[in-house]
Amino acid sequence: MSILEVKNLKKNFGSLEVLKGIDFSLEKGEALAMIGASGSGKTTLLRCLNFLERPTHGQIIVNDKIIFDADDNKSLGDAQIRKNRLHFGMVFQSFNLFPQYTALRNCTLARELMAKERPDFKENKKKIMDEITAEGEALLESVGLKEKMNYYPHQLSGGQQQRVAIARALMLQPDILCFDEP
C-alpha cells in the first residue's frame, strides 16, 4: 500500500506551466529525492503537496484516501485544507523558525494551538500542555539539542536550526515528512 500517490499533478501560474503532470508513489518507510535545476518546480511540488499552493490539475492520495482531486475539490474550505496539511510535515529551506521563541516553543507551538480546539482542553489544560512540552523536549533530545531547548534561533548554528525545524515537523506526527533543500 502506498502512503502517498501523486497522479498527473499540474500547477500553472497564469500561462506558465510549472508542474507538467507529475506522477509518483511512495511506500511507507521509503525516501524519495527530487533532483532538478533551480526553477524546475521542486519547491512548487512540495508546496502543492502541503496545500500552500493549490494544484491546477491532478490527485493527491494519502493512505489510499484521495485528499485532493482537482476535478472535485475546487472549493476546499480552510478547515479541510488544515486537516489535509496534517498529513505532511514540512522542513523549509530557510527553516522558518519564529525568532521570538525558544527552540522548545518553536517545536510545541502548533500542537499547543491545536490542543486549544479540543473539547476537554479547559478541564485538562495543565496535563495536555505538560504532555506537549514533554514530547517537544523528547524530540529535541532525539535530534541532539536537549541542552539547547531554551535557546533562540539566533543563538543556534544553521545545522541546529535545521534540527529544530525537523523536531517541529515531527511534533505533528505527520504521515510524510518533506524537506525543501535539505
Each language-model region and where it sits:
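ABC ATPase NBD coupling module
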Residues: I67-G89, K127-M129
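Helix-to-loop junction immediately C-terminal to a conserved catalytic motif
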Residues: N50
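The feature captures the beta-strand-to-loop junction immediately N-terminal to the Walker
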Residues: I35-A37
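Conserved ABC transporter NBD signature motif
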Residues: G58-D71, N124
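Hydrophobic anchor residue at the start of the ABC signature
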Residues: I166
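Conserved ABC ATPase signature
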Residues: Y152-L156, Q160
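A short, proline-enriched helix->beta-strand linker immediately N-terminal to the Walker B motif
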Residues: M171-D175, E181
